[in-house]
Amino acid sequence: MRINHIDLNGFRNYDFETADFSPGTNVIYGENAQGKTNLLESVYMLAMGRSFRTRFDKEFIGFGCDSAEILADVVSHGREQTVRILLRSGVRKQITVNSVKKTASELGETLNVVLFCPDDLNLIKEGAAARRRLMDNAISQIRPRYAEYLSQFNKFYESKTRILKDWREKPSLLDTLDEFSDGMCRSSAQLIRYRASFAARLADEAAPIHSEFSGADEKLGIEYSTVSAVKDPTASAKEIFYDLCDHMEAHRRAELDSGQCLSGAHKDDLIISINGKNARSFASQGQTRTAALSIKLAEREIYLDETGEYPILLLDDVLSELDTKRQEFVLNRIGGGQTLITCCEDEGISRRTGGKVLHVANGRIG
């Protein structure tokens, strides 16, 4: 799985720019604010249909441009394919694969990416939302139905939250509360099943990677956490649904009093431990960074197991945040697939990986 060629027209600070990539490692270097991350963002969008930096499509359209276009020649599942994303202000984005219209959730059938940026180094110490986002981004690429369930859940959650906040001023809103509670339980049940399965696989893949780096003295653990009333997160969606309904009904008064949704998949988390101790509370910065690296590299292995191909790995200015030992650990494990690395200086990365070098300056790629 790889991108051979990309055209960027009116995208961010790229007017009309093209780039050819090596099937292995590609080192993209240049000073800050020149467009390196914009280039990685365009590749991310080809797989996800959205950005990892903004929710607003209008921000992709370059100054003075009416539209932005990303056009790429990719090789996936043994086939050459063309992926195109067209963005216009005020108009829904257009996505096509080989000129056939696609939804954002369908892009994962053609292209997969794993993004690793400096914020991910804090994955262990951040709140649960960061770890849910990790699960959501990964699962939605290999299980398109998951993205549909996630979209449904978010709509039910937002609607119910508004009711819980405003019902005192508009008591009639409570007439629809049960409808949204039911929808939350149904979509949550599906998300919980997918997440529990993914978390188990992530734990199996990450532990040996972590052990390889840290030695046998440290054991990485990953456990999935969800609503306490869910007896078995790997059970059928129907069983989980009933557990959630019971929990939600028991907390109905508390939800009305607090104005918050107290039951559902938005309560999920991944509990990361090192030698049995909660890493968020007790691990050092070095330990949490090693754990985060192991988790991201494990995510890559899961894609390989699922699709038979490595996803495209995007390392956005992350190597500069790592010491030499951790840099080598990452670089030694990225073989077998295509990798795009951004950095301010090449610093011998291309020599150590045998990769292609691209220089970015003022929105030009050379």
Regions found by a protein language model. Give the residues of each.
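Conserved NTPase motor "head" modules and their coupling/switch loops across ABC/AAA+ ATPases, GTPases
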Residues: 1-31, 171-312, 321-325, 329-332, ...
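Conserved P-loop NTP-binding catalytic core
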Residues: 11, 15-96, 145, 153, ...
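Nucleotide-state sensing region of NTPase/ATPase domains
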Residues: 47-130, 134-146, 203-208, 240, ...
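Structural recognition of the conserved hydrophobic beta-strand(s) that form the central parallel beta-sheet
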Residues: 72, 338-345
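Conserved beta-strand scaffold positions in the cores of enzyme catalytic domains, especially
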Residues: 113-115, 339, 357-359
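Long, charged N-terminal accessory/stalk domains
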Residues: 122-124, 129-178, 182-185
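Short regulatory helix/loop adjacent to the ATP-binding pocket of P-loop NTPases
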Residues: 137, 347-360
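Walker B catalytic acidic pair
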Residues: 316-318
